[in-house]
Amino acid sequence: MSPDDIATCVGCGLCLPHCPTFRVTGEEALSPRGRIAIMKGVTEGLLELDADSVSFLDTCIQCRACEPACPSGVPYGRMIEGAKSDLANDGRVSPRWLRVGLRLLRHHRLLLWSRPFLALAQRLRLVPRRLGLPLLSWRNEEPLRGTTTEPDVWILTGCVMDAWQRRTHRSVAELAERVGLRHGVPSREGSCCGALHTHAGMHEESIELAERTMRSMPGEAPIIVDSAGCGAAMKEYGRLIGTAEARAFSERVVDAVEWLAGLMDSADTAALLAPTRPEKPTVVIQDPCHHRHVQKVHGATRRVLRDRATVIELTDDGLCCGAGGAYSTLHPRLAEDVRDRKVSAIDAAIDAARAGRHDIMVASANPGCSMFLAAAGLPMRHPVDIVRDTILPTDAEGNRP
């Protein structure tokens, strides 16, 4: 926690309406201003870091909605990451079970081998619904494989997305092939980007995984990432590691919808991505926080959907859904309170469109958000999957050949 960073906050409070935990509790200590005051008090020796103070800091979802709202440019994301790292090093946050679980993510085969056991646990109702895991089949889908060792683009496969949402990777690959691009996938070393570890305050592990990810996709080809949280983390490797190599790698990272929007705006590829079906799905856009507040590519979601879907906008100014990486497992009650506001906003938008949940789909470009909202009964889809299915064939039930 840098005193210089802390000093940038002037206490104006313009961040408060944008903070999900403040919105649902009304507690000053559960706002960015309140949490910065705790950081300031602790660093100046005026405040004891007791259990309450730790809890106030730990219950930040790290959505970073406060950053674009702040006229002083307070680097809140960097500050709360530093605070979480200090607390994690002291054993005050991120319990052992979470650390062990996150360390398993680097062992990708183990994650995939666990699928049948997790599928069985789901059917025995041993997996809490609030985790939002999709109902898993007994067998893993075929992994995405690269088409060349010298790709035009890389597609990050990662850990959670590759375990449970491989369909979206396939959508990215099929769209790349449609415009004539050869794709590569990371070597086994790049099985996890470290985003969840950063959220949990596991700073050293975050750096190690970032360096492994960088080694797994060498060269200068763009890196397409279809998980908003992963893309945000990888675009900040330059800040995390602080080397010219890391900054150059971050410059290569592009979110999948950002990449698609560029292709649709290019005269060379736009026609290849034109919709081939007359019917338009009705889509509610739910912006993941790391799309909207960190990467600032939420406009690209609208660009890729506007010509092929009837888009319904929410009126909640991009309020967080409450998922926050592993947040919903650590603070389920607060996460569900935040989610309830998001679900209410989505239902209100659906009602205003004179539709029902069965008539629409909710587009979200982050696996944590989509799984957490799916657990509340919402029909979730990745924007890239929606785009793919308006161009390439599916059967009457939406299955792909």
How would you describe each model-predicted region?
Residues 7, 26-30, 197-204:
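Alpha-helix capping and helix-loop boundary segments enriched in small/acidic/polar residues
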Residues 7-13, 17, 58-68, 191, ...:
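Cys/His-enriched microdomains
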Residues 10, 14-38, 54, 59, ...:
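Iron-sulfur cluster-binding cysteine motifs and their immediate structural context
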Residues 76-401:
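Iron-sulfur cluster-binding electron-transfer modules in prokaryotic oxidoreductases
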